[in-house]
Amino acid sequence: MEISPADSLSISGAAASEVVSEPSVSSSSSSSSPNQASPNPFSNMDPAVSTATGSRYVDDDEDEEDVCRICRNPGDADNPLRYPCACSGSIKFVHQDCLLQWLNHSNARQCEVCKHPFSFSPVYADNAPSRLPFQEFVVGIAMKACHVLQFFLRLSFVLSVWLLTIPFITFWIWRLAFVRTFGEAQRLFLSHISTTVILTDCLHGFLLSASIVFIFLGATSLRDYFRHLRELGGQEERDDDVDRNGARAARRPAGQANRNLAGEGNGEDAGDQGAAVGQIARRNPENVLARLDIQAARLEAQVEQMFDGLDDADGAEDVPFDELVGMQGPVFHLVENAFTVLASNMIFLGVVIFVPFTLGRIILYHVSWLFAAARGPAVAASLHLTDTGLSLENITLKSALTAVSNLTSEGQGNGLLGQLTEMMKVNGSELNGANNTLSVATDLLKGSTVGASKLSDITTLAVGYMFIVFLVFLYLGIIALIRYAKGEPLTVGRFYGIASIVEAVPSLLRQFLAAMRHLMTMIKVAFLLVIELGVFPLMCGWWLDVCTVRMFGKTMSHRVQFLSISPLASSLVHWVVGIMYMLQISIFVSLLRGVLRPGVLYFLRDPADPNYNPFRDLIDDPVHKHARRVLLSVAVYGSLIVMLVFLPVKLAIRMAPSIFPLDISVSDPFTEIPADMLLFQICIPFIIEHFRLRTTIKSLLRCWFTGVGWALGLTDFLLPRPEDNIGQDNGNGEPGRQNRAQVLQVGGPDRAMAALPVADDPNRSRLRAGNVNTGEEYEDDDEQSDSDRYNFVVRIILLLLVAWVTLLLFNSALIVVPVSLGRALFSAIPILPITHGIKCNDLYAFVIGTYAFWTTISGARYAIEHVKSKRTSVLLNQIWKWCGIVFKSSVLLAIWVFIIPVLIGLLFELLVIVPMRVPVDESPVFLLYQDWALGLIFLKIWTRLVMLDHMLPIVDDSWRAKFERVREDGFSRLQGLWVLREIVFPIVMKLLTALCVPYVLARGVFPMLGYPLVVNSAVYRFAWIGCLSVSLFCFCAKRCHVWFRNLHNSIRDDRYLIGRRLHNFGEAALANQNQNQSSEDAGDGVLIGREGDVDNGLRLRRAIQQEA
């Protein structure tokens, strides 16, 4: 028998362990018998034999056989090893069966190490045809149709069970639980036989079933929570017992400890003493309580183990969701699960609703019967006497009233008798009312049992629950009395359930209070969010509308009328305007923080502060603090709107009254659709991307603060200094420059007053640091500090005043200048032939004016910088270069923005709008600007769909690669010829083909057939729809051909496929695998290849640019 190296190592290790375990024996035996076998099996061999044997083992180790990376077994003829990926070493080879099992388990299709996809090819039977016979194909289609039909029938059955049957029965169980008689149930059922009511009952039943499920989940969670509390409590008690026992043992005298040891040494005495102690322990009430607690704990542990065992069994079974709902597996399982759910719902509703309601009905019935039986005779007698007295009084009053009426009929109605008549009439009416009331009360008392049965369902249910609670306490009291009669003491802790309840009451109270606190916190946070994000922006929007209403030529009556007609739209518009203004203020404050010295705006909250958490402030701060903050925000924002919006608008109206009121209406067809899209999708993103507004505004703010701060002597206070930062970092800054603008870091409102510049006076610092002898120097110092503080406040006020005047002029100019310039440029657009004299819109005028003004300023600044640096030749080269870029980009942009959208809009109008709206005997009128607007929308949607990562049937991946290349090139490196050849020209040709081919067929070919003019007009009208139908038919035929071929391959695989063959790394796949691929897959491969070529071109171009 050969011994492998591992076996030899194990043997030698075992022998070594034996030697170590018995050192004396092994040493003696080795010394006495030297010829005894040593642990090494080669130790007693001849050296030559030993050398040969060792070399043979080394050769076997080197020529180790290849094994599978999964099962670690070698390959054989039936199951050879393969190397399907680029891995090497011990994980190179694998069995095909092992790999298939692992792939089915991990749902992977590639190697986890080298990420190489595994390649398989189908293996068919020997008699498998390349094309199925017609009969087999029809049989396969019939089997596939049967499977699909079976799936849909199973799906409809499952949905009807879980969404219709179970909810309907559950809801009717709920209804029948409140029914008092069989007749009432019959009337209730007959009144709910309609489709609408049945569907409504199904919906209510579904909600009820979901509520029951959530209640079960909540009960389970509470059970686990209380179990966890008991475990923690038991652990704490055990720790306390251990601590007490340790302390008692530490305090125990040494003699008692010795006696205990002696008692342990004497077995008989210890046994007698243990018996006596056991009798005493059994008589101790605390030990009896502990024994009952142990028994209760054992019982609860058994119950919990039973439920946990069921949970473990459920977890071990791991039933899939499809099988659980009944989509897979036998139908009997679906019926069983449905009946289980129905039974659980029925039991829950029976225990929670039916039993308490029935008990409440029984109790109320007997209580009303006892009440009627006890008070019936007395009440009847009193009612009889009262009825008799009222009848006599009524007769008397009627007689007196008749007599008085006869007396007053002779013309004395205005005297005393007339007044007496009126009084008697009133008394008679009151008497009749009292008689009626008494009769009603009599009827109620007589039918008290019926009235008791007509109480509300909630009252009856509450009475039933109170009776159940009474029965529970009565049972516990009887059990306590019985045990007390047997001589057991009455302790609350005797009953494990009561002990648990008593122990859990403080915890439940704390949890309830915590839940209520969390609930109130949530209500407070929700209320504050509604105020700060809903009401406050709405108020800002309305205040902005009030301050700018004259700019648009409107009055507040128009706004109120719009609010009354459409309150939701009006509120939404004003809220959006208010929230945009608040965002603008926040952005401006963030720009100020980036320019000013840190600490200047300490009184404003910084959203970028890592320690600032607005939600934490909402939770922690009290309500009165939030109310004060909201009122302060209202005052601040209201004042800012007046100073920065209302006054600039009034100044702009005074400066240029001819341009007001502004017209931003969207009723014009030109601006009805594309206005918001051009403004928010094209213009504003282009401005943000290319004009760098944030950098420009920060530079302007820095220049303004530098100039105004120098004029007011506040430069060191307002702006940060780089040398101060460097000095602080290095620790060796100039002390004079550091002390020149010291800012005392104090908190609260005093920080602004304390941030005063300190003069370069070393004596002042010595006076503050040292001990002074006279009080006059203190007074001079205080007077100087007061003077500096006063001057600082005055300069800050002047700074704010100058800032407000600057913003006032800037906002007025921002309204007047772009609108005037934009109107002048926009007036040239109606001259174009496609516009048909559209009127000017001030939204477009403002955007065009802003573009023109910004372009002029940027070009002038760029030219001035090059002229100052004496680089006129470079400037001319840049001008020439940018003129070429602008011309090239303008041509491409004009084709993309104007020509292509017009073609798309015309095609859409000829396909959809003209056949639907224009009669056959009329000629359509095309509005090109409307077609351009529609085409621009469709072009935008198509480009967004192309740039999405998801695969769509109407989107080609090659277009995504082309658009990404254009995005990578940018505006300055755009390759015009490539864009024209690869993007613009294919789109234009396809659109022209779609427009011209139907026109040629309808106007040139079809009239040659000799049909009447009406028929030719109808053909022309529906020519584009007909061509579209033919194109869709061809596309559907191609897709159906691919689908039938895939269906044929699937049927052939089901019938003749016997397995799959795993290919080795680098081995070519079988030819029939490529033949079985669909044309769509081939097209996808071509597209992927093109995209890869484009990506390679992008990488090569970037590398060349980096080298250059």
Curated annotation (Swiss-Prot):
GO terms for biological process: cuticle development; cutin biosynthetic process; isoprenoid biosynthetic process; positive regulation of isopentenyl diphosphate biosynthetic process, mevalonate pathway; protein ubiquitination; response to water deprivation; suberin biosynthetic process; wax biosynthetic process. Residues 1-60, 237-273, 762-784 are annotated as: Disordered. CDD domains: RING_CH-C4HC3_MARCH6. Keywords: Coiled coil, Membrane, Metal-binding, Transferase, Transit peptide, Transmembrane, Transmembrane helix, Ubl conjugation pathway, Zinc, Zinc-finger. Residues 237-246 have a biased composition (Basic and acidic residues). Residues 10-44 have a biased composition (Low complexity). It holds the Pfam family RINGv. It is found in: Membrane. Pathway: Protein modification; protein ubiquitination. The chain crosses the membrane at residues 157-177, 197-217, 339-359, 362-382, 462-482, 489-509, 525-545, 572-592, 630-650, 669-689, 796-816, 844-864, 894-914, 923-943, 982-1002, 1017-1036. Zn(2+) 2 binds at C85, C87, C111, C114. It is a multi-pass membrane protein. GO terms for cellular component: membrane. It catalyses: S-ubiquitinyl-[E2 ubiquitin-conjugating enzyme]-L-cysteine + [acceptor protein]-L-lysine = [E2 ubiquitin-conjugating enzyme]-L-cysteine + N(6)-ubiquitinyl-[acceptor protein]-L-lysine. Its EC number is 2.3.2.27. It comes from the Eukaryota. Disruption phenotype: Semiglossy stem. Elevated drought tolerance and reduced transpiration rate. Elevated amounts of 18-carbon-length cutin monomers and shift in the cuticular wax profile toward the very-long-chain free fatty acids tetracosanoic acid (C24) and hexacosanoic acid (C26). A zinc finger (RING-CH-type) spans 60-121. Zn(2+) 1 binds at C68, C71, H95, C98. GO terms for molecular function: ubiquitin-protein transferase activity; zinc ion binding. Expressed in cotyledons, leaves, roots, stems, inflorescences and siliques. Expression higher at the top than at the base of the stem. SMART domains: RINGv. The RING-CH-type zinc finger domain is required for E3 ligase activity. This is Probable E3 ubiquitin ligase SUD1. It comes from Arabidopsis thaliana (Mouse-ear cress).
